[in-house]
């Protein structure tokens, strides 16, 4: 499945200062669905190059990191349980930098 | 699948207009709202805060403390919008401080310069180098990475006042948001700083000083500010200051964010707690006066900036760090005057958080 991942608000610094990543992720196990939970663990392993604690806390994003799936607040779609579809656009924005 | 779709559709309308797909869950109310309704309530609530607290008078010149970051960028955008829409009759300006931090402030100032054009607001930049003869880079070279945030915070506070005086404005607005204020309430409790605790929740401060400051975002959640900037594609700068690993404030911030995740109202409730504290009349508060050297407000003989500057210029950078000593006498001269508005100008460490 193809996704567009966008990092903003300073989070791009954790992945080589690249804001937009077009990625291809194969379904992990045999299940035919991919959730945000799966995506986060993939991102942590494959995209985050430094200070992962700035991005994640436990198995979810660090409080203060906003997540949008197709420009919609992930709090409306079930957060970690949000089911992803091919070509979804997922945006991560840190609110923790500067004023 | 059928059931799932139905469920999705049922919960998939904005609970304000009942027409469009919601894009955001409001932390303040937990309402699910669409983009158009979000813009409307976001702007309208700020307008109500401005009106109810009588923040401005028609014809006033107002400077917006602009760092190029999310809060001040959204503030500049929203305030110029509301000024037009509701005929506030304000002359708005952008005021930026150049601390002289290569790779951080020089970049963020580029953002402010673009904002000047985008929003049509005249920009004034005042620099530490011009005001004090030192850039933060030079200060850090001399004192290292300890206490540098103290210098920066103290200098910034005065620099904003001086810049505001140069612009001949009647008021200065800053982008401090609800999360910032909750965090500061907590920090002041942790530090036992009663003087600041009693004033950090005021929407307007310094009314008896040269230039009052106010915080139109006092009740605005950081999440909504960032969402607003994202949806409106506002141009802001977001890099951590290269010199600021302020651990103590960082912990407080993280704690607030953890609380918010469990119960978003916690932020407003902490602000409410801060507002409702009553300071015992027996509490000693610093007495307000003016600095003998530069005339700036100070509770001591010399203001904090002058003490720090003297230390730098004499090669004794530890001077003025920690509890007052040296020029200002061996003891903390804090005395009585219960209830008097405390105004020691030693600033909050770090970042753009001056209260």
UniProtKB/Swiss-Prot annotation, chain A:
C-terminal thiocarboxylation occurs in 2 steps, it is first acyl-adenylated (-COAMP) via the hesA/moeB/thiF part of the MOCS3 homolog, then thiocarboxylated (-COSH) via the rhodanese domain of the MOCS3 homolog. SUPFAM superfamilies: MoaD/ThiS (SSF54285). Pathway: tRNA modification; 5-methoxycarbonylmethyl-2-thiouridine-tRNA biosynthesis. It comes from the Eukaryota. Keywords: Cytoplasm, Isopeptide bond, tRNA processing, Ubl conjugation pathway. The keyword Protein biosynthesis does not apply. It is found in: Cytoplasm. The modification 1-thioglycine is found at residue 99. There is a cross-link at residue 99 (Glycyl lysine isopeptide (Gly-Lys) (interchain with K-? in acceptor proteins)). GO terms for cellular component: cytosol. One of its GO terms (biological process) is tRNA wobble uridine modification. Pfam families: Urm1. InterPro entries: Beta-grasp_dom_sf, Mopterin_synth/thiamin_S_b, Urm1. Acts as a sulfur carrier required for 2-thiolation of mcm(5)S(2)U at tRNA wobble positions of cytosolic tRNA(Lys), tRNA(Glu) and tRNA(Gln). Serves as sulfur donor in tRNA 2-thiolation reaction by being thiocarboxylated (-COSH) at its C-terminus by MOCS3. The sulfur is then transferred to tRNA to form 2-thiolation of mcm(5)S(2)U. Also acts as a ubiquitin-like protein (UBL) that is covalently conjugated via an isopeptide bond to lysine residues of target proteins. Belongs to the URM1 family. This is Ubiquitin-related modifier 1 homolog 2. It comes from Arabidopsis thaliana (Mouse-ear cress). The gene is URM1-2.
From Swiss-Prot, chain B:
GO terms for cellular component: cytoplasm. Keywords: Cytoplasm, RNA-binding, Transferase, tRNA processing, tRNA-binding. It is found in: Cytoplasm. It comes from the Eukaryota. GO terms for biological process: protein urmylation; tRNA thio-modification; tRNA wobble uridine modification. Plays a central role in 2-thiolation of mcm(5)S(2)U at tRNA wobble positions of tRNA(Lys), tRNA(Glu) and tRNA(Gln). Directly binds tRNAs and probably acts by catalyzing adenylation of tRNAs, an intermediate required for 2-thiolation. It is unclear whether it acts as a sulfurtransferase that transfers sulfur from thiocarboxylated URM1 onto the uridine of tRNAs at wobble position. Pathway: tRNA modification; 5-methoxycarbonylmethyl-2-thiouridine-tRNA biosynthesis. Its main location: cytoplasm. NCBIfam families: TIGR00269 family protein. The lineage of its organism: Eukaryota, Viridiplantae, Streptophyta, Embryophyta, Tracheophyta. Residues 328-337 have a biased composition (Basic and acidic residues). This is Cytoplasmic tRNA 2-thiolation protein 1. GO terms for molecular function: nucleotidyltransferase activity; tRNA binding. It comes from Arabidopsis thaliana (Mouse-ear cress). Its EC number is 2.7.7.-. Belongs to the TtcA family. CTU1/NCS6/ATPBD3 subfamily. Residues 320-341 are annotated as: Disordered.
């Amino acid at each position: 499945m193809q996704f567009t991942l966008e990092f903003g608000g300073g989070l791009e610094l954790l992945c080589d200062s690249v804001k937009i990543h077009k990625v291809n992720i194969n379904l992990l196990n045999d299940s035919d669905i991919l959730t945000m939970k799966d995506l986060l663990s993939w991102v942590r392993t494959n995209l985050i190059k430094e200070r992962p604690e700035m991005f994640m806390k436990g198995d979810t994003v660090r409080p203060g990191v906003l997540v949008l799936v197709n420009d919609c607040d992930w709090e409306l779609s079930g957060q970690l349980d949000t089911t992803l579809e091919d070509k979804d656009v997922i945006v991560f924005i840190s609110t923790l930098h500067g004023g | 699948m059928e059931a799932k779709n139905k469920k999705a559709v049922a919960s998939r309308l904005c609970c304000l207009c009942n027409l469009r797909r919601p894009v955001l869950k409001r932390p303040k109310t937990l309402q699910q709202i669409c983009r158009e309704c979000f813009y409307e309530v976001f702007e309208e609530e700020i307008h109500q805060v401005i009106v109810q607290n009588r923040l401005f008078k028609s014809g006033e010149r107002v400077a917006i403390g602009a760092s190029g970051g999310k809060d001040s960028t959204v503030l500049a955008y929203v305030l110029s919008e509301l000024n037009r829409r509701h005929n506030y009759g304000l002359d708005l300006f952008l005021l930026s401080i150049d601390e002289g931090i290569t790779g951080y402030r020089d970049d963020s100032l580029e953002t402010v310069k673009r904002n000047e054009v985008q929003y049509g607001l005249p920009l004034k930049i005042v620099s530490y180098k011009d005001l004090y003869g030192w850039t933060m880079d030079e200060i850090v070279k001399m004192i290292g990475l300890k206490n540098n945030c103290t210098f920066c915070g103290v200098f910034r506070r005065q620099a904003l006042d001086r810049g505001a005086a140069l612009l001949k404005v009647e008021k200065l607005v800053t982008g401090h948001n609800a999360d910032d204020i909750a965090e500061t309430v907590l920090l002041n409790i942790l530090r036992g700083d009663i003087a600041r605790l009693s004033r950090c929740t005021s929407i307007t401060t310094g009314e008896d000083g040269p230039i009052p400051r106010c915080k139109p975002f006092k009740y605005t959640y950081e999440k909504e500010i960032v969402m607003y900037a994202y949806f409106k594609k506002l141009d802001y700068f977001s890099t951590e200051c290269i010199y600021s690993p302020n651990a103590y404030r960082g912990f407080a911030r993280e704690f607030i964010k953890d609380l918010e995740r469990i119960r978003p109202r916690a932020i407003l409730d902490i602000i409410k707690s801060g507002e409702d504290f009553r300071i015992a009349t027996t509490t000693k508060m610093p007495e307000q006066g003016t600095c003998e050297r530069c005339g700036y407000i100070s509770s001591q003989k010399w203001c904090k900036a002058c003490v720090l500057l003297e230390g730098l210029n004499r090669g004794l950078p530890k001077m003025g760090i920690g509890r007052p000593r040296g020029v200002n006498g061996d003891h903390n001269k804090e005395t009585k005057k219960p209830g008097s508005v405390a105004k020691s100008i030693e600033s909050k460490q770090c970042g753009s958080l001056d209260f």
